[in-house]
Curated annotation (Swiss-Prot):
The gene is rplL. Keywords: Ribonucleoprotein, Ribosomal protein. Homodimer. Part of the ribosomal stalk of the 50S ribosomal subunit. Forms a multimeric L10(L12)X complex, where L10 forms an elongated spine to which 2 to 4 L12 dimers bind in a sequential fashion. Binds GTP-bound translation factors. GO terms for cellular component: cytosolic large ribosomal subunit. GO terms for molecular function: mRNA binding; structural constituent of ribosome. This is Large ribosomal subunit protein bL12. It holds the Pfam family Ribosomal_L12_N. Forms part of the ribosomal stalk which helps the ribosome interact with GTP-bound translation factors. Is thus essential for accurate translation. The keyword Ribosomal protein applies. GO terms for biological process: translation. SUPFAM superfamilies: ClpS-like (SSF54736), Ribosomal protein L7/12, oligomerisation (N-terminal) domain (SSF48300). It comes from Aliivibrio salmonicida (strain LFI1238). NCBIfam families: L12.
Amino acid sequence: MSITNEQILDAVAEMSVMQVVELIEAMEEKFGVTAAAAVVAGGAAAEAAEEQTEFDVILTAIGGNKVSVIKAVRGATGLGLKEAKGLVDSAPAALKEGVDKAEAEGLKAQLEEAGATVEIK
């Protein structure tokens, strides 16, 4: 006989706070996971947006001057001609991920000057 999710939820609902804490600790130990990471990520989503330190530079459109955009992508990323062309042709595509704000703004300005449309996330 298998226990349903509803039965598990009912059993947890009847527990005291201390019993739930002990259950969570036992589950963390048994399965090798931590529940704290999920709580922090879910509770601090609004704060994370304000305190963002790493940004992704996304090429959303190439505009009318594809050659200039390819040159700008090569200069910004260090990719070879074939790789840069492939990246530009696959727009929207991530150019760089996890860069600081100053670098992201610099890349955006450089690519927009070449005619591309760029988004920073």
